[in-house]
Swiss-Prot record:
The keyword Lyase does not apply. This is Ribosomal RNA small subunit methyltransferase C. Monomer. The keyword Iron does not apply. Its main location: cytoplasm. One of its GO terms (cellular component) is cytoplasm. It catalyses: guanosine(1207) in 16S rRNA + S-adenosyl-L-methionine = N(2)-methylguanosine(1207) in 16S rRNA + S-adenosyl-L-homocysteine + H(+). The gene is rsmC. Pfam families: MTS, MTS_N. Belongs to the methyltransferase superfamily. RsmC family.
Amino acid sequence: MDPRSEVVLRQQQYLAIKILLINPPADELAQQLAHKHQVSVWTWNFADHQYFQHQSIQSDFAVTFPDQIPDQVIIFVPKSKELLSYLLHVVVSHLPAGQHIFLVGEKKGGVERASKQLQSYGKTVKLDSARHCQLWQTTIETTEQLKPLEQWLKHYSVKNENIQLEIYALPGVFSQNHLDIGTAVLLPYLNQIKLGKIADFGCGAGVISAYLAQLSPHNEIHALDIDAFALRSTEFTFQRNGLASERLHLHAVTGIQDAPKALDVIVSNPPFHQGIHTDYSASEGLCKTAKQHLNTSGELWIVANRFLNYPLLIEQTFGQCQVKTDQQGFKILYAKAT
Protein backbone atom coordinates (compact mmCIF):
# COMPACT_ATOMS: atom_id res chain seq x y z
CA MET A 1 0.00 0.00 0.00
CA ASP A 2 1.13 3.53 -0.76
CA PRO A 3 2.61 5.17 2.38
CA ARG A 4 0.23 8.13 1.98
CA SER A 5 -2.70 5.72 2.20
CA GLU A 6 -1.23 4.09 5.30
CA VAL A 7 -1.09 7.50 7.01
CA VAL A 8 -4.77 8.08 6.17
CA LEU A 9 -5.72 4.70 7.66
CA ARG A 10 -3.81 5.53 10.85
CA GLN A 11 -6.17 8.48 11.41
CA GLN A 12 -9.41 6.89 10.23
CA GLN A 13 -11.22 8.05 13.38
CA TYR A 14 -11.35 11.59 11.95
CA LEU A 15 -13.31 10.53 8.88
CA ALA A 16 -17.04 11.03 8.32
CA ILE A 17 -19.43 8.69 6.50
CA LYS A 18 -19.27 9.97 2.91
CA ILE A 19 -15.68 10.48 1.76
CA LEU A 20 -14.35 11.63 -1.59
CA LEU A 21 -10.77 10.64 -2.36
CA ILE A 22 -9.22 13.14 -4.78
CA ASN A 23 -6.22 11.98 -6.83
CA PRO A 24 -5.62 8.82 -4.75
CA PRO A 25 -3.06 6.17 -5.71
CA ALA A 26 -4.32 2.93 -7.21
CA ASP A 27 -4.12 0.81 -4.07
CA GLU A 28 -6.32 -0.85 -1.42
CA LEU A 29 -7.16 2.30 0.56
CA ALA A 30 -10.61 2.84 -0.96
CA GLN A 31 -11.59 -0.78 -0.42
CA GLN A 32 -10.43 -0.76 3.20
CA LEU A 33 -12.25 2.49 3.95
CA ALA A 34 -15.38 1.12 2.28
CA HIS A 35 -15.92 -1.26 5.22
CA LYS A 36 -16.99 1.71 7.39
CA HIS A 37 -17.51 4.59 4.95
CA GLN A 38 -19.18 5.48 1.67
CA VAL A 39 -16.15 6.02 -0.54
CA SER A 40 -15.91 7.57 -3.99
CA VAL A 41 -12.99 8.73 -6.10
CA TRP A 42 -12.30 11.73 -8.30
CA THR A 43 -9.31 11.14 -10.57
CA TRP A 44 -8.04 12.52 -13.87
CA ASN A 45 -5.68 9.59 -14.40
CA PHE A 46 -7.40 7.11 -16.70
CA ALA A 47 -5.35 4.12 -15.52
CA ASP A 48 -6.28 4.84 -11.91
CA HIS A 49 -9.92 5.34 -12.93
CA GLN A 50 -10.01 1.90 -14.54
CA TYR A 51 -8.39 0.37 -11.47
CA PHE A 52 -11.06 1.76 -9.14
CA GLN A 53 -13.88 0.74 -11.46
CA HIS A 54 -12.48 -2.79 -11.49
CA GLN A 55 -12.53 -2.70 -7.68
CA SER A 56 -16.23 -1.64 -7.80
CA ILE A 57 -15.40 1.78 -6.32
CA GLN A 58 -17.42 4.74 -7.61
CA SER A 59 -14.92 6.73 -9.70
CA ASP A 60 -15.27 9.94 -11.70
CA PHE A 61 -12.74 10.50 -14.49
CA ALA A 62 -13.19 14.22 -14.93
CA VAL A 63 -11.79 17.73 -14.57
CA THR A 64 -14.74 18.94 -12.50
CA PHE A 65 -16.14 18.06 -9.07
CA PRO A 66 -18.43 14.99 -8.96
CA ASP A 67 -22.20 15.47 -8.81
CA GLN A 68 -22.60 13.65 -5.50
CA ILE A 69 -21.46 15.92 -2.66
CA PRO A 70 -19.46 14.16 0.09
CA ASP A 71 -19.17 15.00 3.78
CA GLN A 72 -15.39 15.28 3.53
CA VAL A 73 -12.62 15.15 0.95
CA ILE A 74 -9.10 13.77 1.16
CA ILE A 75 -6.79 15.40 -1.37
CA PHE A 76 -3.63 13.56 -2.34
CA VAL A 77 -1.24 16.40 -3.16
CA PRO A 78 -0.61 16.69 -6.91
CA LYS A 79 2.76 17.68 -8.34
CA SER A 80 1.43 20.99 -9.67
CA LYS A 81 0.89 23.89 -7.26
CA GLU A 82 -1.59 25.42 -9.72
CA LEU A 83 -3.58 22.20 -9.86
CA LEU A 84 -3.82 22.10 -6.06
CA SER A 85 -5.08 25.70 -6.10
CA TYR A 86 -7.78 24.63 -8.54
CA LEU A 87 -8.75 21.59 -6.45
CA LEU A 88 -9.00 23.59 -3.23
CA HIS A 89 -11.12 26.24 -4.94
CA VAL A 90 -13.48 23.62 -6.36
CA VAL A 91 -13.79 21.86 -3.00
CA VAL A 92 -14.62 25.01 -1.00
CA SER A 93 -17.09 25.94 -3.75
CA HIS A 94 -19.03 22.73 -3.11
CA LEU A 95 -18.65 21.99 0.62
CA PRO A 96 -20.21 24.21 3.30
CA ALA A 97 -18.33 25.95 6.10
CA GLY A 98 -17.58 23.63 9.00
CA GLN A 99 -16.72 20.61 6.85
CA HIS A 100 -13.24 19.13 6.79
CA ILE A 101 -10.62 18.96 4.06
CA PHE A 102 -7.77 16.50 4.54
CA LEU A 103 -4.51 16.87 2.65
CA VAL A 104 -1.97 14.06 2.44
CA GLY A 105 1.32 13.87 0.62
CA GLU A 106 4.96 12.95 0.65
CA LYS A 107 7.47 15.39 2.10
CA LYS A 108 9.50 15.22 -1.11
CA GLY A 109 6.26 15.83 -3.01
CA GLY A 110 5.77 19.22 -1.40
CA VAL A 111 3.14 18.48 1.24
CA GLU A 112 4.45 21.17 3.59
CA ARG A 113 4.20 23.77 0.83
CA ALA A 114 0.74 22.45 0.01
CA SER A 115 -0.39 22.80 3.63
CA LYS A 116 0.25 26.54 3.39
CA GLN A 117 -2.19 26.72 0.46
CA LEU A 118 -4.70 24.89 2.64
CA GLN A 119 -4.42 27.50 5.41
CA SER A 120 -6.17 30.10 3.22
CA TYR A 121 -9.49 28.35 3.85
CA GLY A 122 -9.49 27.76 7.60
CA LYS A 123 -7.70 26.60 10.71
CA THR A 124 -5.21 23.92 9.72
CA VAL A 125 -3.60 21.25 11.89
CA LYS A 126 -1.12 18.47 11.20
CA LEU A 127 -2.73 15.18 12.22
CA ASP A 128 0.13 12.82 11.46
CA SER A 129 3.66 12.56 10.15
CA ALA A 130 4.93 9.10 9.26
CA ARG A 131 6.52 7.13 6.42
CA HIS A 132 7.97 10.41 5.03
CA CYS A 133 4.39 11.64 4.61
CA GLN A 134 2.14 14.14 6.37
CA LEU A 135 -1.63 14.36 6.89
CA TRP A 136 -3.21 17.79 7.41
CA GLN A 137 -6.77 18.79 8.28
CA THR A 138 -8.60 22.06 7.71
CA THR A 139 -12.04 23.05 8.95
CA ILE A 140 -13.54 25.18 6.19
CA GLU A 141 -14.15 28.78 7.28
CA THR A 142 -14.02 30.48 3.88
CA THR A 143 -16.15 29.24 0.97
CA GLU A 144 -15.99 30.55 -2.60
CA GLN A 145 -18.24 30.98 -5.62
CA LEU A 146 -17.28 28.45 -8.28
CA LYS A 147 -15.32 30.03 -11.13
CA PRO A 148 -15.81 28.76 -14.71
CA LEU A 149 -13.20 26.25 -15.83
CA GLU A 150 -12.11 28.66 -18.58
CA GLN A 151 -10.78 31.09 -15.98
CA TRP A 152 -8.12 28.56 -15.02
CA LEU A 153 -6.67 28.39 -18.53
CA LYS A 154 -3.22 29.74 -19.30
CA HIS A 155 -2.24 30.42 -22.88
CA TYR A 156 0.80 31.20 -24.99
CA SER A 157 1.59 31.64 -28.68
CA VAL A 158 3.37 29.16 -30.93
CA LYS A 159 4.68 30.23 -34.32
CA ASN A 160 6.65 28.27 -36.90
CA GLU A 161 6.84 29.19 -40.59
CA ASN A 162 3.26 29.95 -41.69
CA ILE A 163 1.57 28.34 -38.69
CA GLN A 164 0.53 30.42 -35.69
CA LEU A 165 -1.44 29.00 -32.77
CA GLU A 166 -2.64 30.00 -29.34
CA ILE A 167 -2.17 27.11 -26.92
CA TYR A 168 -4.55 26.79 -23.95
CA ALA A 169 -3.70 24.65 -20.94
CA LEU A 170 -5.43 23.83 -17.66
CA PRO A 171 -3.57 23.45 -14.35
CA GLY A 172 -1.29 20.45 -14.10
CA VAL A 173 -0.94 19.92 -17.84
CA PHE A 174 2.57 19.43 -19.18
CA SER A 175 4.24 22.69 -20.21
CA GLN A 176 1.26 24.80 -19.16
CA ASN A 177 3.02 28.16 -19.40
CA HIS A 178 5.29 27.88 -22.43
CA LEU A 179 6.31 25.65 -25.32
CA ASP A 180 8.68 22.93 -24.15
CA ILE A 181 12.03 22.49 -25.88
CA GLY A 182 11.33 18.99 -27.22
CA THR A 183 8.15 20.02 -29.02
CA ALA A 184 9.86 23.17 -30.32
CA VAL A 185 12.57 20.98 -31.89
CA LEU A 186 9.89 18.74 -33.45
CA LEU A 187 7.61 21.40 -34.99
CA PRO A 188 9.75 22.22 -38.08
CA TYR A 189 9.64 18.54 -39.06
CA LEU A 190 5.88 18.09 -38.88
CA ASN A 191 5.38 19.26 -42.46
CA GLN A 192 7.33 16.15 -43.57
CA ILE A 193 4.88 13.63 -42.15
CA LYS A 194 2.24 11.80 -44.14
CA LEU A 195 -1.27 13.20 -44.32
CA GLY A 196 -4.15 11.12 -43.03
CA LYS A 197 -5.21 9.48 -39.81
CA ILE A 198 -2.75 10.72 -37.19
CA ALA A 199 -2.41 9.91 -33.48
CA ASP A 200 -0.76 12.37 -31.09
CA PHE A 201 0.28 10.17 -28.17
CA GLY A 202 0.55 12.16 -24.94
CA CYS A 203 -1.20 15.17 -26.45
CA GLY A 204 -0.83 17.50 -23.46
CA ALA A 205 -2.34 20.88 -24.30
CA GLY A 206 -2.70 19.93 -27.95
CA VAL A 207 0.29 21.72 -29.50
CA ILE A 208 1.15 18.92 -31.95
CA SER A 209 -2.50 18.02 -32.63
CA ALA A 210 -3.49 21.60 -33.43
CA TYR A 211 -0.36 22.19 -35.51
CA LEU A 212 -1.10 19.12 -37.64
CA ALA A 213 -4.73 20.18 -38.02
CA GLN A 214 -3.56 23.61 -39.23
CA LEU A 215 -1.10 22.05 -41.68
CA SER A 216 -3.75 20.26 -43.70
CA PRO A 217 -7.55 19.93 -43.74
CA HIS A 218 -7.01 16.29 -44.74
CA ASN A 219 -5.49 15.33 -41.40
CA GLU A 220 -7.78 13.44 -39.02
CA ILE A 221 -6.40 13.98 -35.52
CA HIS A 222 -6.62 11.45 -32.71
CA ALA A 223 -5.39 13.04 -29.46
CA LEU A 224 -4.42 10.46 -26.82
CA ASP A 225 -3.59 11.09 -23.18
CA ILE A 226 -3.98 9.46 -19.77
CA ASP A 227 -4.88 12.83 -18.21
CA ALA A 228 -8.40 14.30 -18.36
CA PHE A 229 -6.98 17.82 -17.93
CA ALA A 230 -4.77 17.30 -21.00
CA LEU A 231 -7.66 16.07 -23.14
CA ARG A 232 -9.84 19.01 -22.09
CA SER A 233 -6.96 21.42 -22.77
CA THR A 234 -6.52 20.02 -26.28
CA GLU A 235 -10.23 20.55 -26.84
CA PHE A 236 -9.91 24.18 -25.68
CA THR A 237 -6.90 24.70 -27.98
CA PHE A 238 -8.88 23.48 -30.99
CA GLN A 239 -11.91 25.61 -30.10
CA ARG A 240 -9.94 28.81 -29.48
CA ASN A 241 -8.04 28.44 -32.78
CA GLY A 242 -11.17 27.87 -34.84
CA LEU A 243 -10.25 24.30 -35.73
CA ALA A 244 -13.22 22.10 -36.60
CA SER A 245 -14.17 19.88 -33.66
CA GLU A 246 -15.20 17.04 -35.98
CA ARG A 247 -11.54 16.67 -37.01
CA LEU A 248 -10.49 16.02 -33.41
CA HIS A 249 -11.02 12.65 -31.74
CA LEU A 250 -10.14 12.55 -28.04
CA HIS A 251 -9.07 9.26 -26.46
CA ALA A 252 -8.41 8.58 -22.78
CA VAL A 253 -5.71 5.90 -22.77
CA THR A 254 -3.49 4.01 -20.35
CA GLY A 255 -0.80 3.47 -23.00
CA ILE A 256 -0.26 3.01 -26.72
CA GLN A 257 -2.11 -0.32 -26.50
CA ASP A 258 -5.36 1.70 -26.28
CA ALA A 259 -4.65 3.64 -29.49
CA PRO A 260 -6.76 3.20 -32.63
CA LYS A 261 -5.56 0.81 -35.32
CA ALA A 262 -4.84 1.50 -39.00
CA LEU A 263 -3.11 4.82 -38.35
CA ASP A 264 -1.05 6.58 -41.00
CA VAL A 265 1.14 8.33 -38.45
CA ILE A 266 1.89 8.24 -34.73
CA VAL A 267 3.67 11.34 -33.48
CA SER A 268 4.68 11.88 -29.88
CA ASN A 269 6.63 13.88 -27.38
CA PRO A 270 6.05 11.01 -24.96
CA PRO A 271 5.39 11.49 -21.25
CA PHE A 272 7.91 10.23 -18.73
CA HIS A 273 6.46 11.32 -15.39
CA GLN A 274 3.78 9.86 -13.14
CA GLY A 275 3.21 12.46 -10.46
CA ILE A 276 6.59 13.28 -8.93
CA HIS A 277 8.15 10.02 -10.14
CA THR A 278 9.96 9.30 -13.42
CA ASP A 279 8.29 6.55 -15.45
CA TYR A 280 9.49 5.55 -18.92
CA SER A 281 7.07 2.64 -19.38
CA ALA A 282 4.62 4.53 -21.62
CA SER A 283 7.31 5.84 -23.96
CA GLU A 284 9.16 2.51 -24.08
CA GLY A 285 5.87 0.75 -24.83
CA LEU A 286 5.31 3.21 -27.67
CA CYS A 287 8.69 2.39 -29.22
CA LYS A 288 8.11 -1.35 -28.95
CA THR A 289 4.48 -1.65 -30.11
CA ALA A 290 3.62 1.41 -32.23
CA LYS A 291 4.02 -0.61 -35.42
CA GLN A 292 0.97 -2.74 -34.48
CA HIS A 293 -1.20 0.38 -34.80
CA LEU A 294 0.17 1.61 -38.15
CA ASN A 295 -0.81 0.89 -41.72
CA THR A 296 1.81 -0.49 -44.07
CA SER A 297 4.15 2.44 -44.79
CA GLY A 298 2.80 4.20 -41.70
CA GLU A 299 5.19 6.49 -39.85
CA LEU A 300 6.41 6.92 -36.28
CA TRP A 301 7.84 10.28 -35.19
CA ILE A 302 9.14 10.63 -31.62
CA VAL A 303 10.88 13.33 -29.61
CA ALA A 304 13.39 11.72 -27.25
CA ASN A 305 15.90 12.96 -24.71
CA ARG A 306 19.37 12.48 -26.16
CA PHE A 307 20.43 10.07 -23.38
CA LEU A 308 17.53 7.62 -23.94
CA ASN A 309 18.26 4.55 -26.05
CA TYR A 310 14.98 4.64 -27.96
CA PRO A 311 16.54 4.11 -31.43
CA LEU A 312 17.49 0.56 -30.43
CA LEU A 313 13.94 -0.18 -29.20
CA ILE A 314 12.46 1.18 -32.42
CA GLU A 315 14.92 -0.75 -34.62
CA GLN A 316 13.89 -4.00 -32.93
CA THR A 317 10.34 -3.69 -34.32
CA PHE A 318 10.69 -1.42 -37.38
CA GLY A 319 14.07 -2.71 -38.57
CA GLN A 320 15.41 0.82 -38.83
CA CYS A 321 15.32 4.20 -37.12
CA GLN A 322 16.51 7.53 -38.49
CA VAL A 323 17.70 10.41 -36.34
CA LYS A 324 16.30 13.45 -38.16
CA THR A 325 18.05 15.92 -35.87
CA ASP A 326 19.90 16.09 -32.57
CA GLN A 327 19.79 19.50 -30.91
CA GLN A 328 19.23 21.15 -27.53
CA GLY A 329 19.38 17.78 -25.81
CA PHE A 330 16.65 16.16 -27.94
CA LYS A 331 16.54 13.81 -30.91
CA ILE A 332 13.76 13.56 -33.48
CA LEU A 333 13.38 9.87 -34.32
CA TYR A 334 11.65 8.54 -37.45
CA ALA A 335 10.70 5.04 -38.52
CA LYS A 336 8.52 3.66 -41.31
CA ALA A 337 6.46 0.48 -41.11
CA THR A 338 6.92 -2.05 -43.89
